[in-house]
């Protein structure tokens, strides 16, 4: 697994391993950022009804936020919703200091655009799903504040980034698939690390036999672009760090 952060992914599944951090950790990081950096006392949480990722991460965030003394107002929107004006109005009327919306990218773009159109001045706080060129495009030139947690921040490995950008620019299809620019998203870097982690397991097994590769995976240790990668008994990565980035609305890049 590359960026599947919900704890249930590996629960009771002995054949699944992943290299990303999990949502209980991510929710705590986000809550601490809201409290310490954004000085929030009240947070409006918004996610898709029935979506395990949204609802799970909102729950972990709420638990951590309340331990820090923050108040959380939680609401959900139905699948395929496209109008978030009433939810944004509620957040404003509730006196929220921050909007936390760990949604999928399609909803995220609408939330950013509609928040800007409504003149919502409170920060929009989100998770790894918002770490996308789509969000940068939606926020560029607008008076919005967007913060996201993620697995990698550009500038972390100059050699890798140079090669990756050269690869993107070398082919028009690569460039188009990357949103028409050479910005490196964390999911791309994680995909790179996941590939080489799997390769380490194949090397350790000395064969492509599935059972042998599976037996080798728990002992794999790999130094990737995103850091040290190893697994616990559940098949989850031993991760204890995350990045928080903000969308630069002038340049259209992450700071």
Per-region residue spans from a language model:
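Flexible loop/hinge segments that line or gate small-molecule binding clefts
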Residues: 1-17
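Extracytoplasmic/secreted envelope proteins and their assembly/folding machinery
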Residues: 6, 27-31, 55-58, 62, ...
